[in-house]
Amino acid sequence: VNKNLYYLISLSGAYDSQSFWRTKDIEKMDTVLNKPALDCIYTDCTDILGSLYFCSDDARTELEKRLAHIPVNALHFIDSGDYHYVSLLFLQRINQPFSLLLFDHHSDCMESAFGGGLLTCGSWVLHALENLPNLKKAVLVGPADEDKTAEQLLKDSRITWVTEAEFEQQKEALCKELSKWPVYISLDKDVLNKEEAVTDWSQGTMQLSQILCFLTDAKKSGAIFLGMDVCGEQKVSPEGFHLDEENGANLNSSTNEKIKFYQKDLTFSL
């Protein structure tokens, strides 16, 4: 098994303008198959209707079918934050008690703005807490204070809420918390500063190095990581590719490259 293997799930086509996943080293050959060795498996889901911001029942069924070949215990790049609900499709396959560690500038615990309990990019954590008995803890790092409006969330003992400002002083306590159950990591790049990511949503000011160092510390403290996903790409405008979008794509690609490189320090196990 290739431990560096990671998975790209294209929903908006944003990865087409990024270079981090393309094979640069022509010399790197698979000696058995005699062709370039790829570290990446690309799954195209751009044709699935009813998947932007919210996930219709039909879209969910189709996504579950297309993602069935992708193991939970791997690194997944899942496109723009508009599709962050894809995390739930991996979480629902975890068949043991676990914690969710979410780095995000938004809580993703909001009731669906579309009503009717619809699964959306802003409600998927709530869906997970309501429907997945194996999810014992959700550790949310980075949400803005105004996201705390949902009072019932603050009363839910399964949720640990840490703002950016609190993160450094809370790290030790979080490491202890994350050693209780195996952990699935979800990183929305909108938690990062604008020198490291360009997203479709309001952003925080965290640094990628802060997050990666914390994951290393958590692992040293006994955390077991099940898998990880990354979202927060900038969607390409329908009218075409502009210079600022090219700059954003290059920035996001560079950050994704660092995450991809870091994954060899993480061992995912189910």
What are these regions (language model features)?
Residues 79-131, 136:
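Hydrophobic alpha-helical segments and helix pairs
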